[in-house]
């Protein structure tokens, strides 16, 4: 057979055996995939990125692009594999860490998700890449879901403990009532027995009521263990300590926005409007709300 085997950037004969037709390069396939992605044709875009990978399997961005397609199609295992391959090729890839964190978030691997999202955020700052609120938003969601998961386990454990203690109290009640009945068998006057049984019933009713009240107090405190999003910084995702507002109307924690201005650039991270440190104004109303929240919720430091 004449001719050389087809290679990237090489040529192949047209259907009519005429002039050679240039086959698309890996970069051209990637660009075609980008156009399909913009059109929300995710399966077709993923296929294009796959062909680009076949052409050149050593470019991390091809894997992250395909991973995003898989994320859109909720094919998390495939997305996970592509992100990990991308990180093997480029350990400093912000998108690989970001998409990997999103995969792990969807798969409920919250600790791993938080670690990768935090890494993505740190790398974005180091490389002066602006992802707006995308990474911080995903990180806030991951932290909240991890907290909710921990709380659900606590609730389940408390429910099991409540049931166990209730059974113990009920069993002790029955045992004492039966013992009282045996001790007074044959008595002609059973008024004394009834009085003792009433005392036993009252005692164990109080045990049950006290236990229910204790669990109710714990439950009420647990219900309050949630930091509202509006009290969290847009950059650190943590409870703000020194809130300040920008001309765009966005409130940040001062130390975080000042660090952003010094290390990344003089613009608002969310709106991308020009911003300097002199334009930051203390948000005294928000500070008052935050201080009140902290004083009423001592658990905040461990959130």
UniProtKB/Swiss-Prot annotation:
It comes from the Eukaryota. Residues 1-10 have a biased composition (Basic and acidic residues). The modification Phosphoserine is found at residues 19, 23, 25, 149, 273. The keyword DNA repair applies. It is an enzyme of class 2 (transferase). SMART domains: TPR, Ubox. Residues 143-303 are annotated as: Required for ubiquitination of FOXO1. There is a cross-link at residues 2, 22, 221, 255 (Glycyl lysine isopeptide (Lys-Gly) (interchain with G-Cter in ubiquitin)). Its main location: cytoplasm. Monoubiquitinated at Lys-2 following cell stress by UBE2W, promoting the interaction with ATXN3. Auto-ubiquitinated; mediated by UBE2D1 and UBE2D2 and enhanced in the presence of MAP2K5. This is E3 ubiquitin-protein ligase CHIP. It comes from Homo sapiens. The gene is STUB1.
